[in-house]
């Protein structure tokens, strides 16, 4: 991360599964200090589902405490499956309303992440005033044979964080080499929505990929 071009970055997102399990807080502290030095916001991708058959993920309180300690702005979870009967939404909302940390759910590449299920979940959470944002992953739709452009058009008003990928034949490509009309999506997004490049990039191509995005954003 120390080699990243400071001028093109507002925020970074780290993935929980990439941390050394015995040194998570030690590594987070180092990353948080780097973010502070560069004026970057820090986002954290939790490798867990927020909802399951027993209700909501009880570990969220622990993750929020860690986020507050290391100045993490946003925690992202996979949606999972909402079981309305077993979920204490009042308790969940109390947790979410008593922190400055934003929490988002993401469309995952399985049966819980289809457009039908995402719309159902987002509408239910919105109707019941549950303080959860939505991370739109532009690539995950391909793995479940759904159209990311249709999904984007139907969900764009709910998006609070955007994960950018370009996909071809279910392989992640460099931008402009896949089938995703990512420029259209960026132009349709609210200008305050953070955009993350969420795919493997060779070190010598990182700046090129970021500059492709910057070129589009500067013309909005």
What is each model feature region?
Residues 1-10, 26, 32, 39, ...:
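Histidine-acidic metal/acid-base catalytic patches
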Residues 8-23:
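N-terminal substrate-binding region of glycoside hydrolase catalytic domains
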Residues 15-19, 45-51, 79-82, 106-110, ...:
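Active-site beta-loop-alpha junctions enriched in small/polar residues
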Residues 21-29, 82-92:
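Active-site-adjacent beta->alpha loops and helix N-cap segments on the catalytic face
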Residues 53-56, 113:
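Conserved glycine-rich "GG(E/T)P / GGGxP" loop and the immediately following alpha-helix
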Residues 60-89:
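Hydrophobic alpha-helical segments and helix pairs
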Residues 100-120:
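Conserved anion-binding
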């Amino acid at each position: 991360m120390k080699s990243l071009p400071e001028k093109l970055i507002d925020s970074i997102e780290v993935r929980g599964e990439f941390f050394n399990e015995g040194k998570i807080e030690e590594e987070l502290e180092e990353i948080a200090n780097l973010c502070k030095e560069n004026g970057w916001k820090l986002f954290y991708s939790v490798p867990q589902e927020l909802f399951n058959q027993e209700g909501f993920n009880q570990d969220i309180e622990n993750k929020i405490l860690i986020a507050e300690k290391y100045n993490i702005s946003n925690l992202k979870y996979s949606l999972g499956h909402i079981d309305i009967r077993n979920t204490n939404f009042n308790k969940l909302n109390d947790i979410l309303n008593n922190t400055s940390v934003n929490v988002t759910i993401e469309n995952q590449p399985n049966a819980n992440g289809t457009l039908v299920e995402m719309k159902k979940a987002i509408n239910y959470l919105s109707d019941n005033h549950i303080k959860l944002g939505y991370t739109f992953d532009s690539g995950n739709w391909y793995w479940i044979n759904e159209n990311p452009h249709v999904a984007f058009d139907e969900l764009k008003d709910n998006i609070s964080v955007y994960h950018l990928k370009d996909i071809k034949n279910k392989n992640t490509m460099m931008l402009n080499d896949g089938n995703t009309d990512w420029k259209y999506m960026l132009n349709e997004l609210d200008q305050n929505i953070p955009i993350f490049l969420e795919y493997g990039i060779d070190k010598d191509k990182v700046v090129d990929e970021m500059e492709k995005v910057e070129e589009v954003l500067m013309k909005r």
